[in-house]
């Protein structure tokens, strides 16, 4: 083995904050469906604690063997709206508590899948689940929730968008951390290893291992070596770096799936930042020549980064999936936080950036008195970007505090300045409800 590659890898881990962000085990709960909610909960608990009992131990063993930090071990499950629909329960908080209890028992960091897919309309279980979200998140520590309100094939369910504006407000009122564990999607993917949007799709195998990597610091260090060179060189540098990062992700995923005796799913190519200095996507964009993220040129820089990461990653791994792109969560990226506080990055520019990257308005704090209709309208805008561009977009927004306040979440969730929003009303627009039809270019058959 080339000694240069060995020292490069050591440097990536020790100096540039490279880590495996998550090993996520997807578990199907379709065989746990029961008309009696108590029996369903017993089956759910038994299956998760059986299938995931060794996940944390195996993750720690691989981390120690390879010398690579594996930050989170997580589980995603079949959308609970499907599982709960067979019961006559009026809410699914009991199922959420069961998921939480199972997550604590096996020692994982988060469990995702308290979810509903309502892009074309509500079924019984969907409506019950959505109305259960505020209390489900308030009464659990590790449960994450997501709702898919639109898709390129179906259009946007504006009645669901309206409801989610209300649910986000209710969730914020019920618990300070609840909204950090709630994502509203368009074009949600079935094999996402990242929280809070992970759920195990019904088309997946019974149990699967998916891996998410994190390496903005590694990319930034590589770009420092080509300062002032053309964008051709920048793109090639990012591509080669993404190849190395993804190779390690694939190795970890294969080792984990072999030891756990389950199928290896995908590596998610997303560059996921943390609040630590030196682990920021914003600083990567600034390294390309921007004085501060949010200035003119930011969207173009992000487009180059996103595309080069995908090209490098696809060459390194035979199974790529999830969201796969650059994440731009405000609270989880110290460069984004600095740009918001300096006034160079606002909500409108973030929205433009979401037309490029793999997520939407992520971990953004807005004033607590923001009307539910304005939150719903933000969701509608993001869903429209995703639906028209045939890509995944999302909103994870936290109505808390007053404009200019700094909200502390702690850990990987970081801290977020409360951002200014447009005060003009969207209430009459949101009140219409109904369905925004699928775009003309969605008809492929």
From Swiss-Prot:
InterPro entries: UPF0210
SUPFAM superfamilies, per database record: PFL-like glycyl radical enzymes (SSF51998)
Domain of life according to the entry: Bacteria
CDD domains found in the cross-reference section: RNR_PFL_like_DUF711
Entry's family note: Belongs to the UPF0210 family.
Oligomeric form and interacting partners: Homodimer.
Protein name listed in UniProt: UPF0210 protein Ccon26_06850
